[in-house]
A protein has these predicted regions:
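Bacterial N-terminal signal peptides that target proteins for export
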Residues: 1-6
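Cleavable N-terminal signal peptides
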Residues: 8-9, 19
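Sec/Tat signal peptide C-region and signal peptidase I cleavage site
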Residues: 15-21
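N-terminal small/polar-rich segments of proteins
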Residues: 21-97, 128-180
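Short, surface-exposed beta-strand/strand-loop-strand elements in extracellular ectodomains
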Residues: 101-109
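Extended, solvent-exposed segments with strong compositional bias
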Residues: 113-133
């Protein structure tokens, strides 16, 4: 019986012994997302104004001012900006004092609360404005059209463009990039 009591005491002592200390390791997991801005569908749209002169041969401002297009884009940085640069409608045919071959206008690009503008009569791009986190439509429209001399319009094709730029803030909290 002593052997049985001794065995029971040994078994109890073995189970009551403190466990070995546990050791843990930790692995941190991290990643990042770069500030980016993108246009969907290659960032391209067309404003086809059709006939831009009145029956009397002068510029039809209403036809030009009706020009509108929609771009789709996004920016994932809270300090992203947007600006516009408008280039006049030009006919490469030579004009004379009685005729105009240029149409000037104001271009506006509206994305949420941001609405930068540029006039074709001003050199360079218009002022950049904050757009922040943005995903959606950018409505581009034309207004305030005019021809330099309010003269008759030269017949032919007129070509211009409106460049809308979305810019991320790649400095992560610094100053946004400036318009060219």
């Amino acid at each position: 019986m002593n052997k049985l009591a001794l065995f029971a005491a040994a078994a109890a002592a073995a189970t009551a012994a403190p466990a070995f200390a546990q050791a843990t390791g930790e692995v941190d997991v991290d990643g990042y997302v770069d500030d980016r801005c993108q246009f969907a569908i290659l960032g391209h749209a067309i404003i086809d104004l059709g006939e831009i002169s009145d029956d009397d041969g002068s510029l039809d401002e209403a036809a030009v001012d009706a020009g509108t297009a929609t771009l789709q884009g996004w920016c994932n940085g809270s300090a992203s900006t947007m600006w516009v640069e408008a280039f006049p409608l030009i006919n490469t045919a030579v004009a004379s004092p009685s005729f105009d071959n240029r149409v000037d206008y104001r271009a506006t690009a509206t994305a949420g609360n941001a609405a930068p503008v540029d006039d074709t009569t001003d050199a360079g791009a218009g002022a950049e404005v904050p757009v922040g986190l943005f995903n959606g439509d950018i409505l581009v429209d034309i207004s305030n059209s005019s021809s330099p001399n309010n003269a008759l319009m030269v017949a032919g094709d007129y070509v211009g463009s409106i460049v809308v730029t979305l810019a991320p803030n790649t400095s992560f909290g610094g100053e946004p990039p400036t318009a060219p």
